[in-house]
């Protein structure tokens, strides 16, 4: 009964899955592309989505033997996949705002999981280079596909066991 009540409460709240969320800290760290009144959170709080929006998550797996070059190749593939995913904006059954928001920002969520296994992925300079590469790859492929460049490209998602499963 307790679990059933928990699920009902989650459903009727309209907020999605529960969690601990510090709104003050989130507002201090919100991206510039978000107006104060628009910013809130959702189950993907680290992406800073608009209401009625989602991103195109893709993951590159960092391994102990990766070099900056091998991680750049992995991030490039993940970015291309995310950019292609961003072309899919036909959402029957959802309000038109979903399509509008997703087409305007074409958000990607290129994630690098397995960071603790890789010295390169722990290096701030390498991470900056990987982010810059992802942004450039998205820009190039968005132009080829005739869509907007993503307003945001990279993220760090809590990946759980995906780094083990995606070996």
Predicted regions mapped to residue ranges:
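Exposed alpha-helical structural elements
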Residues: 2-6, 56, 70-73, 126-129, ...
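Internal maturation/activation junctions in enzymes
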Residues: 1, 89-99, 107, 112-158
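Function-dense linear segments that define catalytic or interfacial modules
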Residues: 11-119
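Polar, glycine-rich mid-to-C-terminal structural blocks
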Residues: 1-15
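Short amphipathic alpha-helical surface micro-motifs
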Residues: 2-5, 36-45, 136, 145-147
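Active-site and channel-lining beta-strand-loop segments
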Residues: 10, 151-167
């Amino acid at each position: 009964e307790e679990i059933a009540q928990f699920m009902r409460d989650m459903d009727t709240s309209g907020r999605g899955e529960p969690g601990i969320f510090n709104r003050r800290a989130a507002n201090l760290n919100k991206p510039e592309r978000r107006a104060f009144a628009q910013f809130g959170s959702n189950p993907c709080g680290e992406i800073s989505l608009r209401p009625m929006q989602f991103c195109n998550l893709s993951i590159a797996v960092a391994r102990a033997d990766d070099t900056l070059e091998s991680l750049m190749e992995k991030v490039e593939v993940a970015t291309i996949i995310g950019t292609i995913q961003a072309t899919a904006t036909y959402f029957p059954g959802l309000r038109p705002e979903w399509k509008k928001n997703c087409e305007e920002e074409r958000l990607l969520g290129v994630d690098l999981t397995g960071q603790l296994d890789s010295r390169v992925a722990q290096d701030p300079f390498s991470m900056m280079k990987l982010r810059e590469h992802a942004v450039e790859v998205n820009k190039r492929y968005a132009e080829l596909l005739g869509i907007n460049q993503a307003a945001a490209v990279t993220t760090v998602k809590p990946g759980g066991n995906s780094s083990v499963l995606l070996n």
